[in-house]
């Protein structure tokens, strides 16, 4: 190889190295303590877990818990509002420190770590009164059109259930994905879909808010799952610190009180072995 070609080759390699993506694996707890704040990715369209009040303030069950946990760590909270579909990618990229209200799934556990659970979740089906749907039975949903939030556990659950229907020679449920729960409910009210599948506790809030709409809860679908906060896998110290703060809030009764306030009931939550196999 002559000198000119060598120079061109070396320069090309140098430019290639500069343009390669850089993956940062720093422990987020160090930055949280240094900056005096924890950056939280949140989609505040999921009442009663997280939503905005009439003044635009982010409120709900998880924001109250996050504020208390952050105070226990001696830091403030900075929210970064984004669509739910962008939250886990932001967490993995390291542009945020944590996110609340994630269904705990084996697939997500491969990509992120979980703080100990803050709640439990069971999905349900909601429809308009007077429609042909009477129950949440999968066979009854076969062939119907259902709205779900994109990239959520309910969407993944329904995709898995569609495989079951197909294996039995039955029609799949046609799934239409939306960014927010409000969009799924609007699609239902406008009769663009036959039903909506999402967390049961969210539907109680939705029915209360939309008293003018003839919404009816058809029943539960799928099993119970824990809900937890997510943290980047490169930050085990932050995960441990947040878990420690939640354990304090469980021990002094604060977590149970917040569950009663926002859900109207309490649930017993595991602290170990809570990721489904």
Feature map (PLM): residue ranges:
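Ligand-binding cleft/hinge of the Venus flytrap
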Residues: 67-75, 154-177, 207-211
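Flexible hinge/capping segments at coil-to-helix
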Residues: 129-146
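Periplasmic-binding protein-like
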Residues: 44, 120-127, 154-157, 208-277
